[in-house]
């Protein structure tokens, strides 16, 4: 999944996308932080060792924290943001859509207005296979996606089929 994300970022940047906002649950998050967003592994381990105190609030599960960085693409520098993630699977999806829409408005690039495309900001949502199929918020977010006030012009959805969330065996394995 890391090579796929990297390819999406590089191609989107090559087409002129200036920001990409990623939403995902915990599985694969640390890998993405280090290998895509460029977070220093030493800093990551310091957070887990308790050497870094949160600036405000009571703290959260370490792998729920967000992060942002800039990367070079064929089209120039692009800003990447990994959204903070609550423990409720898939709830990050509508939050991410709102964040992207706000960024598009800030850039005066909201889709469906004055022939704008919204291509300056790309939402990317990474789902686990069980959560994608089982959480109604995914379909509810799809339902909002084409309404005038909520559309972002399209979202890249990646479903990771890790078969961890399902409790029944595959028929071939039974």
Give, region by region, the residue ranges found by the protein language model.
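Conserved internal helical-beta-strand scaffold that buttresses enzyme catalytic cores
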Residues: 1-156, 160-173
